[in-house]
């Protein structure tokens, strides 16, 4: 790779961030954007937390403005991020998707499709203190039942005050450093309707005795579950906090409570009992405040200390509490790398999950004696995409060329639902899955983008086709 001049860097960087320097609003889960941001982040070009989604567009712009690229390949990625943000936040955006069937393996960050065929039209408008994203979706061959062929999934409205974004709508979330899944808050299900609050910019505290925590973010959300028959109108209340005391380390803590609903206590006192961990204080445990999950995650980057663009990450989420700490834990761990090849970028990871309790106990994770439909909405998990009691090992490598073509190969080995739990409709039968998935995406005309995928899955009981293919198109339109 060839060093580029300071003048070229300055001019190129100014061009790359010019349209985003004054951007405001939220950015929903997007795999292409995350991979490019992670490539820069893990190489020390930018500093940005990527474990809590939606992201704030102001924080992305702030990170890009402070970017320190040294190679032409890094400048290419900066420009690509700018282009992707412009596409995602275009005034109008038309998206279409079609497939032969659903993939036979669990899908990772930003990859969930709720139907075999869909057409979406989105309208975006934002200013210094507001952000509106209105989206209508028409679906056919639904994978996740919704009671209607038309829905507003992905829509939201948000206002900003004192560096805080407060939003309402149906927004997907993601809590944790994993690519294949999050043990506590993933996007494998349809988004719930609710409110969400988070910081716009993740600056470190100005108070001297808190400055050591470094850049930090929080997210507080309260949503109502859809079509949850066990306890209709059940609520999901969650909070997450991340801190970065060193450039090489990010720590996160997450907690969620499944609470209230039809026929359930919903007083502030009952909520407070749950919030303070008094889950079993009543003689009649039918008054137990709710179903809770909590835990921690981390990401350790080697670039700041060793100069290697490689990072380790992990997540631990418990179904119970013991000694003020999570217990009956599920685990996730992985390693990722981000390299340059000329002006092309290479991203890869290897990741493992175990959603059994303490890596052995079954029929416990994502279940509850009151909320008997479990930690699932419409049968699809709010946490890990394979649901409870599963084990997964997956690896993926992606090549991104200078002209923004993405070529990827993903390998998956998973054991899912060994007890045939009826609440898990994503994988309703005990099965061993061995799959390969190939992907290509590229710009076919100006900013019109085509996404394609081809997969094969070896399984015993899946109702999905062993071999399948999909295609998607994105058409951003600006006034």
Tell me what each language-model feature is.
Residues 113, 130-159, 176-188, 322-325:
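Surface-exposed loop and membrane-interface regions of Gram-negative outer-membrane beta-barrel proteins
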Residues 194-372, 388-389, 393-395, 400, ...:
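Signature for the C-terminal beta-barrel architecture of outer-membrane proteins
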Residues 26, 49-51, 71, 79-91, ...:
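Short loop/turn motifs that connect adjacent beta-strands in outer-membrane beta-barrel proteins
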Residues 11, 22-111:
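N-terminal periplasmic/intermembrane-space "pro-region" immediately following the signal or transit peptide
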Residues 1-21:
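Gram-negative bacterial Sec-dependent N-terminal signal peptides
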Residues 241, 465-479:
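Outer-membrane beta-barrel "beta-signal"
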Residues 98-102, 127-129, 138-142, 161-163, ...:
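Transmembrane beta-strands of outer-membrane beta-barrel pores
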């Amino acid at each position: 790779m060839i060093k580029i001049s300071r003048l070229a860097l300055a001019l190129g960087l100014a061009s790359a961030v010019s349209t985003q320097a004054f951007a405001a609003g939220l950015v929903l889960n997007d795999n292409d954007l995350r991979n490019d941001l992670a490539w820069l982040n893990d190489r020390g070009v930018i500093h940005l937390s990527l474990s809590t989604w939606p992201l704030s567009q102001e924080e992305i712009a702030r990170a890009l403005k402070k970017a320190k690229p040294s190679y032409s390949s890094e400048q290419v990625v900066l420009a690509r991020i700018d282009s992707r943000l412009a596409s995602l936040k275009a005034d109008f955006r038309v998206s279409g998707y079609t497939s032969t069937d659903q993939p036979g393996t669990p899908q990772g960050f930003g990859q969930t499709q709720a139907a075999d065929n869909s057409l979406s039209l989105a309208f975006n408008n934002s200013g210094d203190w507001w952000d509106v994203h209105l989206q209508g979706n028409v679906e056919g061959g639904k994978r996740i039942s919704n009671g209607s062929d038309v829905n507003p999934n992905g829509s939201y409205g948000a206002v900003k005050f004192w560096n805080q974004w407060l939003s309402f709508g149906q927004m997907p979330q993601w809590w944790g450093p994993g690519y294949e899944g999050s043990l506590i808050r993933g996007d494998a299900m349809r988004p719930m309707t609710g409110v969400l609050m988070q910081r716009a910019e993740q600056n470190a505290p100005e108070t001297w005795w808190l400055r050591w925590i470094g850049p930090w973010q929080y997210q507080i959300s309260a949503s109502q579950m859809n079509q949850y028959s066990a306890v209709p109108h059940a609520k999901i209340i969650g909070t997450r906090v991340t801190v970065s005391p060193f450039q090489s380390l990010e720590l996160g803590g997450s907690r969620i409570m499944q609470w209230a609903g039809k026929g359930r206590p919903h007083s502030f006192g009952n909520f407070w009992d749950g919030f303070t961990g008094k889950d079993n204080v009543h003689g009649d445990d039918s008054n137990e405040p709710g179903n809770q999950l909590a835990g921690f995650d981390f990401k350790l980057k080697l670039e700041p200390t060793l100069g290697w663009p490689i990072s380790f990450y992990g997540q631990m989420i418990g179904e119970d509490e013991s000694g003020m700490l999570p217990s009956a834990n599920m685990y996730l761990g992985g390693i990722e790398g981000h390299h340059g090849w000329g002006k092309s970028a290479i991203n890869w990871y290897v990741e493992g999950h175990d959603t059994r309790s303490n890596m052995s106990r079954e029929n416990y994770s994502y279940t509850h004696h009151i909320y008997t439909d479990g930690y699932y909405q419409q049968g699809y998990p709010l946490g890990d995409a394979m649901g409870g009691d599963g084990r997964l090992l997956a690896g993926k490598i992606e090549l991104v060329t200078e002209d923004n073509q993405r070529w990827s190969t993903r390998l998956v080995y998973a054991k899912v639902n060994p007890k045939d739990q009826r609440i898990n409709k994503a994988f309703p039968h005990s099965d061993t899955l061995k799959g390969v998935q190939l992907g290509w995406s590229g710009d076919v005309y100006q900013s019109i983008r085509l996404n394609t995928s081809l997969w094969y899955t070896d399984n015993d009981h899946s109702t999905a086709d062993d071999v399948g293919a999909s295609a998607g198109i994105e058409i951003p339109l600006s006034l």
